[in-house]
Amino acid sequence: MPFVRHPEQEDSLEERWLFEAMSECYIPLINVYDNLIKDNINFKITMSITPPLMSMLEDEYLNERYLNYLEQSIDLSENEIIRTKDNEELNKLAHFYNDRFKKILDIYNKYDRRLMNAFRKFDRLGVLEILTCSATHALLPLLTINPETIEAQIATAVQSYTECVGHKPRGIWLPECAYTYDLDEILKKYGIKYFISESKAILNASPKPKYGTYTPISTHNGICVFGRDMESSRQVWSSFMGYPGDFNYREFYRDIGYEAPMEYIAPYINRGGIRIDTGIKYYKITGKTDNKQYYNREMAMKKVRDHAGHFADGRNAQLEYAKEHMDVSPLIVCPYDTELYGHWWFEGPDFINEFIRMSSEDWTKYELTNPYDYIKENPIVQCSSPCPSTWGENSDYSVWLNPSNHWIYRKLHR
């Protein structure tokens, strides 16, 4: 999430990126965590909240703009209830969105219109481990020609986090999981204990780790490295078998902002007349067809429960098998973009809710933890040098450094 504060514009398209993430990802996840706590479900989860995002979530001006955005969403959904009154299926969905937007407003007000108040609470309760990130989401390995630039990125991130959360960060999400040699030395200087890496950083480490990504490794500077598990990753990310592509889930690309008559939708889109997403989407994925069917919330929630059960069963079997071949506790690290949960995959927060609840049931033999607690409980890990890598295509830097953009790096390094 880039820094998108534009008071010089009456209606900023970029600010809507933040507002959409707040309504579709962060507030729904806050609601999930609150309900789990209320129901006495023991859980631990880890989230990266970048310095720019923390700053924006605390910004009074942006919060005022978000409140206006949310009130507009409620107003639009109320008009949709009227507009769709002759279509029973659409009218039911219009009521669903109206109730949803009002619930989002209630949660927003509950935390005094500062979402970091919620995340700080979860941090204090020990259910949420908040990771920092580099100050401006810089791909750090491409800045090694100027090491002081990398140091400034980490120093600023740690300072920003400490001022906002109230203590220093224990872990960091390196942008795009991008690692290169000696980066851990700078992380150690600023008190970072661990980071998350792409699986190849572990699998191709030297010497080769005994247990692959099922345990972290330690760099020679004492920084623990947790590798992404690819089996659990594919079950969510894969365009062929990933859960979010199920035909019963909500279709992302069909929004009334693009389909409703301009004279009707104009007050709710960009004031320049640019059609944009409103968050009200009436169709399900259906399949590879333009003839989409109406979204059925009840059927989508049934699929959420099925997929959460499948995911929990898979992790249970995976860990039970690993235990038979290990003399230490195996760990599965499942990192995903936060925006997947609620924005791209509308039902994503519901999936997290169901998975955590199933993980607390007796039939699962594992427990949810976070990287820092795992280190405390398993302080002896293999020392190995992680392989330079990213979680981008080919696990290298080519997405960010290639013939289409290499010219800019000379200018950046000046």
Q: Model-flagged regions — what are they?
A:
Residues 46-53, 134-136, 171-180, 371-376:
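Short, solvent-exposed turn/loop segments enriched in Gly/Ser/Thr/Pro and often Arg
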Residues 139, 192-205, 367-370:
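His/Asp/Glu-enriched short active-site or ligand-binding loop at hydrolase and phosphoryl-transfer sites
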Residues 147-174, 316-326, 330-333:
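CE4/NodB-like, metal-dependent polysaccharide N-deacetylase domain
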Residues 45-47, 130-133, 170, 194-197, ...:
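Hydrophobic faces of well-ordered beta-strands that scaffold small-molecule active sites
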Residues 34-42, 114-132, 151, 162, ...:
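Acidic (Asp/Glu)-rich catalytic clusters
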